[in-house]
Each structure stands twice: as C-alpha cells, then as structure tokens.
Amino acid sequence: MAKLYKYDSGLTLLYENNTINKSTSVEMAFDCGSRCDGKLAGLSHFCEHMFFTGTDKLTRQEVSKRYFDFIKTNAFTSNNEIVFTGSIISARLAEYLQTVQDMICNSTFSASAVEEEKKVVVQEIVQDTDKHARHADRWKRYEMYQLEQFKYGVLGTVETVNQITSKDVKNYVKKYFVRNNCIISICTPLSFGRVKKLVRKHFDKQMPSNNLKPLPYSRNKLIDDENVKLNHQDIDKNFLSVVFKSKRKGGDLKYRALIATIGNIIDDISDGLTKELRLDNSLVYSMDAYYTINKVNSAMELYTEISSQNIKPCLDVIISYINKIVKEGFTQQQFDKELGKNEYYWETNVQNPDSVRNNLTTYRFYDRFVSSKDIYEAVRGLTLDEVNSAMRELFTKSKVQVLVYGNANKQDIYTIKQIQKKFNI
C-alpha cells in the first residue's frame, strides 16, 4: 500500500510497502538543481560533489567509504533536483538516513576541498564525450516546454566552475538543503509506522528548515509563429525532433496511462521506420519516440539523428507515418502487445524495490500521488477505442513543432506551413 505523509517541518515522505523483496530502496530529492545555479553554471552539480569531500569528523575517503558501503548507492544532479539514492539492507535504513544527514549538515566545504574538487569537475567537463547531444537536448527541451529549468546545463563550464568559492557552496546548501525542500521516497518491507519514526528520528529532527517556498514550474510565453526552430552548430550531424505538444497536464491518472500506452506503441512501430530513414547513407541511427507528461503540459516526440540533406525526406516519412496511424488507428494486436508488456513489467517490477520507488517519485512532477499499482491498473483498464481516440486527439489538436540542432540551414527544412499542408489530419 502506498502512502504520502507530511511532517510538521514540511518534509514529505512517500512510502510503499513491498514484502516480496527484503531490501529497501530510498531516494532523497531536494527541489533545486541547475535551474538554481544563477550566474555560476554548474554550481548545483558542484555542491553534489562537495558532499563527498569530508565532514568535521570524517575525511574525504571516510565519507565516500561510508556512503558507498551500502548495497548500491548513488547521487546525481538534474535540471530540477539533487538526489541521493540507495538500495540497502532494510536493517540499515536508519544508518543510511543518518549518513546523508551528516553529509548535508556537517560537511566542512573548506576552501582547500573546493579547489581540489574543481579539478575533478573540470576534468569531467573536458571529458564529456556527448556534449553535442547534451546541448541539443537542453535546447530542445527548453523550446518544447518553455520551462526555465531547461535553459541551463548541469555540468556548467570550465570558466564558471573555476569561479565557485567555498562561500557559494555554503550559501547554496543553506538555502536549498532544508527539510521543507525535500521529498523522501521509500519502498520497503518495513511497516509505515516504523519508517515514519526512523525518518523523523534520523533525518527530520536533525535537518534545518527555512522559509523557502516551493519552486514553481516557471514558464515563458509560447511564441505561436515559431514552430520550426533551427540552432545552427558546426557539427557533422543534426538532432531532429518532431514534437506534438498538448495542453493536457499530468495530474489525470487515466490520461497518463493513455499517453504512456500511445508512446510505447509508437516507439515499437517507429523501430520499423529506421530502415526507411537510411537515406543515401545518411546519419540516421534510429527513430525513437518519447512521451513526457508534467504539471504544465504533455508532449509526444519523434526523434532521430540525420544528415542535413535528408531532413526533408525524413520529415516526409514521419508525416506519412502519422497520417497513416491517425487514419487507420492502432491494431488490436499492437494494443494487446502493449497490455502484455504492462503485465510483464508489473510482475517483474513489483519484485524490484527500485522500480516501485521510481513510480513513487513521479509525485514530484505531477499534481497527484500515485503508486505503481495505480499506474498498472490504469493501463490495464484501457480499451483500444480509448487509446485510439486519445492518439487522434494528440496528433490533431496539439501544436506541431520541429526542432533541428546541427549543421542544417533553413533551406534544408520545411516551413511550418509546408509541414501542416502535408498532414492530412
């Protein structure tokens, strides 16, 4: 059974009982991330690193050994948050909570540690072999959703990271690493009452609070006449996305189930498009479909990498593909296959505490708290007619946007009016 509990301090606990597996999965997420970097791009990611550089009682090596001594632990920074994750023996839950709390509250963030960690992070930036894809993804997501947090890269630059001081780190941690800005998600065989007490004793009571208000999903005004966007870069390929943006939001559980089902079926079908897109030995690796649902809107994206001379032929294939499925609908066989995958994932994921906990954490991005079972049953209850109806609504009533990041020029891409004429929907 899944539960949501808010402590008086503002700390949020998401809990789901799982007796099939004896281990416990924990995620501690702080609402900040690179959107809070300000002028010091990469500050959030740098702060995540600094939690492992030593406390007033433990050295850098001792902190790392203590944190990574559990079954499987990690920490990461995204546009939206900084997160600690752990798959641990259930009997060590209190120890894990205390370990993270100690790293947050008692790290020294000394000037010497900051200078030492700069070398590590700068090397990470220099060795980033996928930087074009990262830049393309960040630009694309900002254009798709017009959300401020997608403007900023997580790693930052060598120049901005080298400007970070011990004071910058301390101020950032003091502002954002407070209990009223944290959501803890736990999937465990331990009882809810037991978990609630452990979190209160070993984390909630020892963490500071402040008057920080929840960060909004800030957005800019959409520009309706700029539905084809080109970001010209001196690279030998293009990242092409065809996006269908809906105003429907993610709080509706049934709509989430519909979009997920549509996205998964389209992703299966799009694998067959890869052969059609291998035009003149162009740079096409595969055609993928992604769906996104959040508090602001939802979107379906068809994505590939391609050479500039084949962007128009590629768009022709995609448009023809969308026209066909809107006209004919998904088949019963395609729908049944997706339902079968849903059953399979439920049977396997319910045995994996990390998977169950991942479903809990989606609370941060939606207006509604749901459990893994809620999602499974919502998909299970769909009909083919409902899925086809939602699919047609998505493709016929959404805003179409084409985004190209790479070496293409305007003449290599259709205008939005040309694209709209090609759609028979």
Tell where the protein language model's regions lie, with residue ranges.
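An aromatic/glycine/proline-enriched structural segment found at the starts
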Residues: 146, 150-155, 159, 178-179, ...
